[in-house]
């Protein structure tokens, strides 16, 4: 068959580590052993030249992994991929260096794709005209919005003229005018017989533009064929899926993960599992390697301690006796404060996931009172519990004296720990957002404690009211949302910010708590709770909630 792209039994998995030191230990272990995330499993298909293939599926089904494999960004662990010609990936900020300007990124990406310097200079005016981002073309890409990154990435990729074009959600962040321009350019590629992979959650765009479709389902190809048939079947599945409650969805997802061997799995070599003697030998080797690692670690620690003692003798540390005396005098007061805080924290729980319903009764079919997201802190009501089938529910206090019920599967006891960061870290976040989204981002936290009338009177832009959430009054201006409780601003949420997870960790450091599956991160400062929530479609932090303690 005259194909352009061919996948044969392709599997892609990622090794999971709990902490950075595990990567060092992995040097002494068998690479086949450990916990892996299976993004794709045994995927096979062929795409003829000139086809436009839509890739659809739920979040986390492997769409972006598939696009990276086609574009050669990553390599498969098993199976074979055959691409005839060059492939270019268009995704939000894909292949763009945030420290370089737009012009410099054009030159760099062109050279990386094998173009000569003369050819790059020739296409630069076309790329600038298509991207249409004005004076920002000479600014660092890190100052761009998501839409501007998508514009530049799309303009570069289509003007490099690849044989295979992979578009991963790049049209989801632009305005309608730019989207129409992109679709027109894609139709030109279509007429030239180019092969295009179009990844999108917009089924209408997929249906109208594509000739075929691949439905990815928990890392496997559930259906591949005519776009009308595949999209129709996927729509029917979505209709049934969207009618499920959040609790039913969680249960359904767990069942499908087990059935399709998708997600986090423990890997062992088959020969080892089927041979008890071999398994015993592997365990002995593993213990021996652990002893070697332990010996090296102890030697390093001894060396560090020796150096520390040596320099301590050379540079004696002065003791602040006055500070010690004050600490002793205030010990009783601090203990009383800690006891009081502990009693409060015993009733505090944190929500572990996004979109969790708080219901009127202890039942998944009961009326929904509110929706809680990862990082929300809730207070239980007298530790009242109830069981419904296999689910346990606990009674929680809402605002304005309301009482609701939430499944204990989605909450966990919350206690402050030693990972509290400085309040000043919040300024680093707002300073970064200010460069991209304007002055209002930096000033937003200054409105904590203001009444709704004071907020409206002092905020520089009109505030639009939204439906209340968990008893809180919600008002919004663009990317900034305020939550008002008991007529005081208690929460500020920055939305649609598209911040990389690496950048979040660079600014705030190690999180106190996290949901590694959903890529959500929780931080605590002296005065605030900070919840950074991701959108798995874009694999970036999309919102940051700041709550005053």
UniProtKB/Swiss-Prot annotation:
Entry's localization field: Cell membrane
E.C. number(s) listed in UniProt: 7.5.2.4
Stored SMART domains: AAA (SM00382)
Primary location recorded for the protein, binned into one broad class: membrane
CDD domains cross-referenced by the UniProt entry: ABC_KpsT_Wzt
Cellular component GO terms, alphabetical: plasma membrane
Reaction catalysed by this enzyme: ATP + H2O + teichoic acidSide 1 = ADP + phosphate + teichoic acidSide 2
Residue spans crossing the bilayer: none
This protein's UniProt keywords: ATP-binding, Cell membrane, Membrane, Nucleotide-binding, Translocase, Transport
Sequence ranges assigned to domain ABC transporter in this UniProt record: 22-243
Annotated region (Unknown), positions in chain: 244-549
InterPro entries named in the record: AAA+_ATPase, ABC_transporter-like_ATP-bd, ABC_transporter-like_CS, ABC_transpr_TagH-like, Bact_Polysacc_Export_ATP-bd, P-loop_NTPase, SH3-like_bac-type
A Gene Ontology molecular function term of the record: ATP hydrolysis activity
Pfam families named in the record: ABC_tran (PF00005), SH3_3 (PF08239)
Source organism superkingdom: Bacteria
Family: Belongs to the ABC transporter superfamily. Teichoic acids exporter (TC 3.A.1.104.1) family.
Function: Part of the ABC transporter complex TagGH involved in teichoic acids export. Responsible for energy coupling to the transport system.
Self-association state and partner proteins as the record states: The complex is composed of two ATP-binding proteins (TagH) and two transmembrane proteins (TagG).
UniProt-recorded name of the protein: Teichoic acids export ATP-binding protein TagH
Origin species: Bacillus cereus (strain ZK / E33L)
Gene: tagH
């Amino acid at each position: 068959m005259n194909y352009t792209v061919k996948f044969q039994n392709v599997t892609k998995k990622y090794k999971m580590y709990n902490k950075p030191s595990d990567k060092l230990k992995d040097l002494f272990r068998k690479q086949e052993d450990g916990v892996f995330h299976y993004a794709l499993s045994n995927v096979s298909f062929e795409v003829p030249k000139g086809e436009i293939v839509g890739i659809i599926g739920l979040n986390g089904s492997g769409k972006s992994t598939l696009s990276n494999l086609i574009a050669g960004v990553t390599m498969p662990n098993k199976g074979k991929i055959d691409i005839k010609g060059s492939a270019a990936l268009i995704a939000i900020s894909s292949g763009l260096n945030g420290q370089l300007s737009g012009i410099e990124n054009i030159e760099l990406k062109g050279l990386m794709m094998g173009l000569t310097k003369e050819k790059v200079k020739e296409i630069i005016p076309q790329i600038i005209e298509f991207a249409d981002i004005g004076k920002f073309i000479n600014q660092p890409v890190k100052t761009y919005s998501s839409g501007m990154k998508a514009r530049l990435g799309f303009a570069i990729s289509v003007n490099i003229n690849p044989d295979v074009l992979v578009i991963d959600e790049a049209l989801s962040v632009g305005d309608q005018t730019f989207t129409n321009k992109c679709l027109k350019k894609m139709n030109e590629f279509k007429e030239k017989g180019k092969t295009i992979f179009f990844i999108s959650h917009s089924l209408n765009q997929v249906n109208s533009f594509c000739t075929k479709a691949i439905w990815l389902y928990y890392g496997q190809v559930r259906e591949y064929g005519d776009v009308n048939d595949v999209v129709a079947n996927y729509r029917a599945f979505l209709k049934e899926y969207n009618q499920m409650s959040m609790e039913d969805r969680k249960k359904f997802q767990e069942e499908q993960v087990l059935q399709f061997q998708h997600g986090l799995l423990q890997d062992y070599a088959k020969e080892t599992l089927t041979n008890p003697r071999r398994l015993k030998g592997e365990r002995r080797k593993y213990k021996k390697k652990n002893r070697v690692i332990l010996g090296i670690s102890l030697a390093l620690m001894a060396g560090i301690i020796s150096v520390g003692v040596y320099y301590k003798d050379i540079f004696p540390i002065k003791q602040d006796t006055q500070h010690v005396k004050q600490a002793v005098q205030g010990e009783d007061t601090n203990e009383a404060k800690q006891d009081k805080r502990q009693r409060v924290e015993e009733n505090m729980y944190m929500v572990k996931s996004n979109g969790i319903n708080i219901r009127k009764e202890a039942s998944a079919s009961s009326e929904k009172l509110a929706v809680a997201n990862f990082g929300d802190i809730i207070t239980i009501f007298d530790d009242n519990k109830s069981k419904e089938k296999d689910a346990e529910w606990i009674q929680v206090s809402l605002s304005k004296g309301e009482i609701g019920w939430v499944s204990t599967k989605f909450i966990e006891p919350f206690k402050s720990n030693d990972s509290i960061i400085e309040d000043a870290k919040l300024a680093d976040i707002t300073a970064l957002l200010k460069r991209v989204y304007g002055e209002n981002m930096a000033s937003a936290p200054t409105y904590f404690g203001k009444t709704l009338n004071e907020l409206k009177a002092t905020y520089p832009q009109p505030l639009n009211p939204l439906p209340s959430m968990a008893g809180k009054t919600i008002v919004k201006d663009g990317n900034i949302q305020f939550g008002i409780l008991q007529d005081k601003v208690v929460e500020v949420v920055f939305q649609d910010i598209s911040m990389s997870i690496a950048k979040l960790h660079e600014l705030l450091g190690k999180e106190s708590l996290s949901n590694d599956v959903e890529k959500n991160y929780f931080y605590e400062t002296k005065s605030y709770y900070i919840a950074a929530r991701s959108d798995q479609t874009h694999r970036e932090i999309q919102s940051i909630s700041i709550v005053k303690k």
